[in-house]
A protein has these predicted regions:
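Catalytic core of bacterial c-di-GMP phosphodiesterases, primarily the EAL and HD-GYP domains
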Residues: 6, 17, 46, 80-84, ...
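The catalytic core of metal-dependent phosphodiesterases that act on cyclic dinucleotides
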Residues: 165-225
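C-di-GMP signaling machinery
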Residues: 8, 14, 23-69, 79, ...
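Active-site core of bacterial EAL-family cyclic-dinucleotide phosphodiesterase domains
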Residues: 49-111, 148, 209
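Short, intrinsically disordered, charge-balanced linker/junction segments flanking boundaries
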Residues: 1, 88-91, 222-225
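Residues at or immediately flanking beta-strands
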Residues: 1-3, 35, 67-69, 142-146, ...
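Nucleotide second-messenger and two-component phosphorelay signaling modules
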Residues: 31-32, 62-65, 77-79, 98-99, ...
Length: 225
């Protein structure tokens, strides 16, 4: 693999060119085989932005999830018009140049998955959602909350144990929490879904498939699950 850069004024800016050369080589290797990558400034700017967000995410997770918030999107019964639940949505903001900047979930969630930080961050969301559900059930009997579960959580953590822990901590019935299983980022999640489905059935935890049909979840695989 080969990374190619156009080096002008190399001696004056050696450190910067060294970083760019390392970046270009990594890009070439990521292409597979004997890939050749020609340095693009926009690619490098995007890379630096991602590294900055990753650093902020690591800091937030180790600092009691400062910068993370959970928003709730109401779930409404169409027949009655009443609110019967909510979907928990993870949000993240960080300081950049002294100003608070909200980062799109499209940007930060893949980075959480890439770094494995989605596991502790996911537990944070679960706990926050369970606490909110406990409070809301005092006013709306039967209120439930939907929580998105990443494929990384399915593969690399005992997510069903995390869900049970949150349910038990707030003395909630199992049906009060519904896991939305997302499939993005992995092509064949069938074995993991099957195992998780069995665990959920045993513990009477509801689950649904999010973004149905965008990845592994064609009808053939659904039959297997």
């Amino acid at each position: 693999s080969t990374g190619i850069i156009h080096a002008t004024k190399l001696l004056k800016y050696y450190d910067e060119y060294r970083k760019i050369a390392v970046f270009s080589l990594k890009q070439a290797k990521s292409m597979g085989g004997n890939g050749v990558y020609f340095f693009e400034k926009e690619d490098y700017k995007l890379f630096l932005k991602k590294e900055k967000i990753k650093s902020a995410l690591r800091g937030a997770v180790t600092n009691e999830f400062e910068g993370f918030e959970v928003y709730y999107q109401p779930i409404i019964d169409c027949s009655s018009g009443n609110i019967i639940g909510a979907e928990a949505l993870m949000r993240f903001s960080m300081y950049s140049g002294g100003k608070k900047e909200s980062i799109s979930p499209v940007e930060f969630i893949p980075l959480l998955e890439e770094t494995g930080l989605i596991i502790p961050a996911g537990r944070f969301v679960l706990n926050e959602a369970a606490a909110m559900c406990h409070e809301m059930r005092q006013y709306i009997p039967g209120f439930k909350v939907n929580v998105n579960i990443s494929y990384i959580q399915m593969m690399k953590s005992d997510i069903w144990k995390d869900i049970l822990s949150s349910i038990e901590q707030y003395n909630l019935p199992p049906e009060s929490l519904c896991a939305e299983l997302t499939e993005s980022g992995y092509t064949d999640m069938t074995p993991y879904f099957y195992t998780l489905r069995k665990k959920f059935e045993e513990k009477k935890i509801q689950f649904i498939l999010d973004d149905f049909g965008t990845g592994f979840s064609n009808l053939h695989c659904i039959v297997k699950i």
